[in-house]
């Protein structure tokens, strides 16, 4: 969006608006969809439709060259809003398969391994894009192609835009093992209208029984706030890095590779922490780390380190990350990637520990609501703060507050100890 719009501050504002609209759509539909699918039984048919839609929307972003998009900016914003909504539905349906596939005892490790594996694939993809499309023609290394493969035109942003087609293709191919190998729930005898009415009744009953489900509802309230903060970091982190550090495609690919490697460690770390200290304490530690590091990120820039001016020389003559602020920013971003990935995995595991087993689908519907339907809040705060402050750093400042509020609410959640202790209790 920075290249398509031409202004990083405006780009951050427009992306915030798109995610806000997508979040509103999910808020109105996700819990009822989760409850209805719970009544129908199988999740995979719905998941297949969501994945197919995601693939098409992501691929459509190919038509956004920086020199006059084939799609108008309004259409691009609508596509991003659609991706936001579809990803939320995907998360809900995918998470509802976690416990049937891995069981209660294996949910934590499976969740962490899944995120670690996904980020490992991301590393391979980003390195491939770097070697095939970003570096050729920019550095004189003999082992590289002389120009981007397939004759892609840099003037039209094609080496950047090809990533949308690659991501869409990998998503389609990567979904095949899930549909082939992961077990699904048995189909009920209910028709779609009957499941809709029964699911609506389940949600109404859940609201009526709020006192009986107070503990998981407190957790979901906490997650609603801190996940908004984490989602804002994920959505705007790339825009923020490109804007405040003045990074182009080459640097952003290197940044993405580094963060993906760090995220692999985060996924593996989550599984270990969930088993040894329990997912609740794990989430607390991960959020505390996020709050500290995200605050430090606000003090970074091309000419400043941790809120202090910097004007030193280059550290080396390489193609990217040649200054101390860039190296420090890279390190802080890596810690954020570790903590965010671990927090996502641990919070997903925590819900499987505190939610009633027979209401898992409904609570995962509410889980998506707490993490995605209120995505309008994070983007709205970022959009408003960016407009008022006039800088990207001001725009990201509310994120720290969301993380802190979520951590405070999490203190009131019971349970979430290591599985052996919880079973014994």
What is the predicted role of each segment?
Residues 28-42, 265-279, 300, 305, ...:
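Helix-to-loop junctions at the C-terminal end of transmembrane segments
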Residues 49-70, 289-322:
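C-terminal ends and interior cores of transmembrane alpha-helices
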Residues 1-12, 235-255:
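Short amphipathic helix-loop junctions that connect adjacent transmembrane helices
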Residues 62-63, 170-181, 300, 396-425:
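Multi-pass alpha-helical transporter architecture, strongest
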Residues 43, 133-168, 316, 321-324, ...:
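A membrane-interface helix-boundary motif in multi-pass transporters
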Residues 89-102, 342-355:
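Intracellular juxtamembrane helix-capping segments at the cytosolic ends
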Residues 37-52, 275-291:
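Cytoplasmic membrane-interface "Motif A"-like loop-to-helix N-cap segments
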Residues 183-220, 316-320:
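Juxtamembrane intracellular "pre-TM" segments in multi-pass secondary transporters
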């Amino acid at each position: 969006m920075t290249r398509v719009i031409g202004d990083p501050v405006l780009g951050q504002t427009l992306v915030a608006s798109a995610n806000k609209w997508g979040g509103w759509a999910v808020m109105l539909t996700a819990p009822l969809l989760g409850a209805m699918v719970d009544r129908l039984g199988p999740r995979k048919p719905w998941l297949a439709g969501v994945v197919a839609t995601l693939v098409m929307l992501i691929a459509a972003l190919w038509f956004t060259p920086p020199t006059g998009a084939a799609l108008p900016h309004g259409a691009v914003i609508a596509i991003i809003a659609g991706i936001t909504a579809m990803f939320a539905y995907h998360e809900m349906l995918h998470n509802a398969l976690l416990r049937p596939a891995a069981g209660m005892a294996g949910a934590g490790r499976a969740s962490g391994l899944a995120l670690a594996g996904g980020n490992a694939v991301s590393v391979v993809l980003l390195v491939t894009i770097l070697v095939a499309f970003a570096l050729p023609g920019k550095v004189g290394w003999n082992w590289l192609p002389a120009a981007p493969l397939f004759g892609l035109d840099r003037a039209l942003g094609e080496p950047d835009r090809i990533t949308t087609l690659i991501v869409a293709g990998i998503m389609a191919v990567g979904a095949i093992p899930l549909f082939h190998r992961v077990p699904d729930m048995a189909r009920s005898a209910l028709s779609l209208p009957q499941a809709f009415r029964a699911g609506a009744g389940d949600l109404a009953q859940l609201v009526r029984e709020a006192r009986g489900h107070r503990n998981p509802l407190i957790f979901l309230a906490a997650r609603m706030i801190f996940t908004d903060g984490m989602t804002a970091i994920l959505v705007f982190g790339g825009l923020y890095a490109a804007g405040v550090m003045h990074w182009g495609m080459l640097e952003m690919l290197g940044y993405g590779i580094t963060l993906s490697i760090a995220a692999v460690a985060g996924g593996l770390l989550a599984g270990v922490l969930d088993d040894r200290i329990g997912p609740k304490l794990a989430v607390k530690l991960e959020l505390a780390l996020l709050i500290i590091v995200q605050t430090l990120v606000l003090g970074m820039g091309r000419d400043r380190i941790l809120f202090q001016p910097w004007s030193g020389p280059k550290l080396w003559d390489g193609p990217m990350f040649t200054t101390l602020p860039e190296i420090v920013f890279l390190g802080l971003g890596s810690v954020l990637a570790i903590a965010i990935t671990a927090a996502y995995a641990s919070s997903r595991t925590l819900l499987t520990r505190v939610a009633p087993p027979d209401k898992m689908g409904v609570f995962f519907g509410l889980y998506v609501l707490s993490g995605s339907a209120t995505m309008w809040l994070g983007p709205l705060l970022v959009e408003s703060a960016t407009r008022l402050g006039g800088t990207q750093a001001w725009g990201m400042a509310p994120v720290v507050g969301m993380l802190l509020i979520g951590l405070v609410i999490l203190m009131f959640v019971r349970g979430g100890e290591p599985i052996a202790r919880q079973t014994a209790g």
